[in-house]
Amino acid sequence: MDATFWAFIALVIFVAIVVYMKVPGMIGRTLDERADRIKKELEEARTLREEAQQLLAEYHRKRKEAEKEAGDIVASAEREAKALLEEAKRATEEYVARRNKLAEQKIATAETDAINAVRASAVDLAVAAAGSILAEKVDAKAAGNLFNDALAQVKSHLN
């Protein structure tokens, strides 16, 4: 019996003790538990990844909606500003037109007043000239006849 035989016997006894103590089952259970734990962690990681992708897609969608809404707001503001500008321009043009018309009316009134004043002055001058000419050339009897004729003409024009 040499040392190899005793080493073989020791190995057989060791294997028998290991089998008797159910070490292979414990190793199997430990490996199974570890595999289950790894499987659960992988499933949890997959679930978290899917949730993250859903959140990312939702944030992209919300960002696009916000960009679209901002674009709509800017377009609406531009339309309103353009409308306000056109309204202000129209109101200014109307104001200028009213002021021009009023100024033209004042000018026309001033022209009419000036023409009437010139005519009145001309009439006064003509009456004064006619009066002085008549005073020099007409005697009292002819003046009375002229006065009566003029009075008759005025009466006929008034009736």
Curated annotation (Swiss-Prot):
Q: How does it sit in the membrane?
A: Single-pass membrane protein
Transmembrane portions of the chain: 1-21
Q: Where in the cell is it found?
A: Cell inner membrane
The molecular function terms of the Gene Ontology recorded here are:
proton-transporting ATP synthase activity, rotational mechanism; proton-transporting ATPase activity, rotational mechanism
What GO cellular component term, any one, is given? Answer: proton-transporting ATP synthase complex
Q: Does the keyword Ion transport apply?
A: yes
Q: Which PANTHER family match?
A: ATP SYNTHASE SUBUNIT B, ATP SYNTHASE SUBUNIT B', CHLOROPLASTIC
Family label: Belongs to the ATPase B chain family.
Q: What does this protein do?
A: F(1)F(0) ATP synthase produces ATP from ADP in the presence of a proton or sodium gradient. F-type ATPases consist of two structural domains, F(1) containing the extramembraneous catalytic core and F(0) containing the membrane proton channel, linked together by a central stalk and a peripheral stalk. During catalysis, ATP synthesis in the catalytic domain of F(1) is coupled via a rotary mechanism of the central stalk subunits to proton translocation.
* Quaternary data: F-type ATPases have 2 components, F(1) - the catalytic core - and F(0) - the membrane proton channel. F(1) has five subunits: alpha(3), beta(3), gamma(1), delta(1), epsilon(1). F(0) has three main subunits: a(1), b(2) and c(10-14). The alpha and beta chains form an alternating ring which encloses part of the gamma chain. F(1) is attached to F(0) by a central stalk formed by the gamma and epsilon chains, while a peripheral stalk is formed by the delta and b chains.
From the Swiss-Prot or TrEMBL record, give the protein name.
Answer: ATP synthase subunit b 2
